[in-house]
Every structure is written in structure tokens, then in C-alpha cells.
Amino acid sequence: NFQGSSGPDIPIFCSGLTDRDPGKDDSDNVIYPEKDTEVESKNPVVSIKDEIDSNTWTRLFVSPLKTFEYDLATYNPKLLATVLKSIWPTPNGTVCTKLDKIIAKENSYSDMSLLAKHAKYIYEHIESDEIGKGVFAYALAEKITDDFIVPNYISNAVLWACGGKTL
């Protein structure tokens, strides 16, 4: 039972996934965190995570960085840039030129701030009017391979829903 509701629990493991949504910094700039960086969440659901997790059957799994799409771009920049380039409406324009530079990095980043900039670029173009999350998701699903890195919070959410265990 959640937030004082009454009645029987449904004995099924249920995972929730939510974005961290770090918001803006003191200069009013949207935050795009670097990999493995702690950031404060502005998502109100995160504040009730402990309450959700206290139920036998429910767990809330929160993005450690920003959003689902941003996190995937942080862990898989080459693949996401490749997919985005394949569906971008102007293949010879500046967007595809920048995506080529990201692809050429071969996921090899010693500078985490550059990785964050590239993930931001990918994220902003996925969210653009030219593409959109839904179209991008379908294109990405066609290209996922065994070496695709699934962030731990997503893996743990799936594992929890399948039997109440995590990594």
C-alpha cells in the first residue's frame, strides 16, 4: 500500500524508472552532468523514492545523470550518433558533420566534459522537432547489438520486475 491506501497488495514486483532532471545551475543554464557525477534532482518523484522502495513489491530506479536518452548517449555515444545521423533529414549539413566527429571518437573519451558535450548534442537533436523521441527509439531498436551498454539503473529495474533482485 502506498501513501496510506488500504486494501491488499498485488503480489507482483513492479519497477518504476524516472529521470533525475537536474534542472538548472546558478547561472540558469540547463545541467548536463558528466558521467559518474552526483547531481541533485529536481524531479519531485525522486523525493518519495524511499517511500516507494519501502513496499515489498515496488522499487523506483532513478537515472544517475539526467534522462533516459541522455544517459544512453553518455554510455553509447557512437551508436546513438550513428543512428541519429541515419535518420537526420539533411545528411550533408552541419548536424551530420558534428555527428561524424562523435562517431570518429569510437566511444574513447579521456575528457569527461567532452563526453558530456557530445551526449548533450545527441540528446538535443533526439528531442528536436526534426526527429523526436519516438522515431529515434524505433531507429535505435533496429541497431542495438550485444555490446550496447545498458546503464545499471535500467538493468536493475528490469531485473527487479522479473523477480525482486538487482545487480
Predicted stretch roles:
Residues 1-167:
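Acidic, divalent-metal-binding catalytic cores of TOPRIM
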